[in-house]
Amino acid sequence: MFIKTSTTNETTWATLKAAVDNGTIAQGDLVIFNLKNGEEVAVRATQDRNGKWFFVLEDCLADERCMNKRGTNKGAWAACDMRQYLNNTVFALLPDELQALIAPTTIVQIVDGERVETEDKLFLLSKTQVFGKGRWSDREPEDTQLLCFLREKDRVKECGDNGTWWWWLRSPEASSSSSFAYVISHGISTNYIASYSYGVAFGFCLI
């Protein structure tokens, strides 16, 4: 028989950055902190299959948000309202120490046959990062699955007082001109119209 326990320690973002650099951070470590508006959030440290470290929101922000004010996925991630919201409004809510340590991450999507790249400090995850390789992955050629999402139950997130909830991904639905992918409340993927508001769970990388 065994008992499994966990420990909680105070730390700083600079210490976490050093842990990423020297390899002492552990897959699945959870970092809890407050946004400048007082909201408490947690991010989980995880690697992709190439060994790159990411920090991913454990649950959604309290407020839901649409991908675009209009029901369109034209321009995909690069052109969507959500991208501007995360990299302006939400980024400004992060602690100053964390802001200074976040590295711009290159996001690559194939949109209408063309390679489109953006540099983002905060970003939604792609369908490939959450669900692994599939028919959609040719449109996300640089992405691999994050290790924190290998099990279906690990893709479930809560949103404010809603309990388990739907949360957006940055991947546009190829068969539709109006939809992006999202994760439903029991951890599988579908897509819906971009103007609907669902949960927001961003990721970032450190310098």
Tell where the protein language model's regions lie, with residue ranges:
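Collagenous Gly-X-Y triple-helix signature in extracellular proteins
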Residues: 1-207
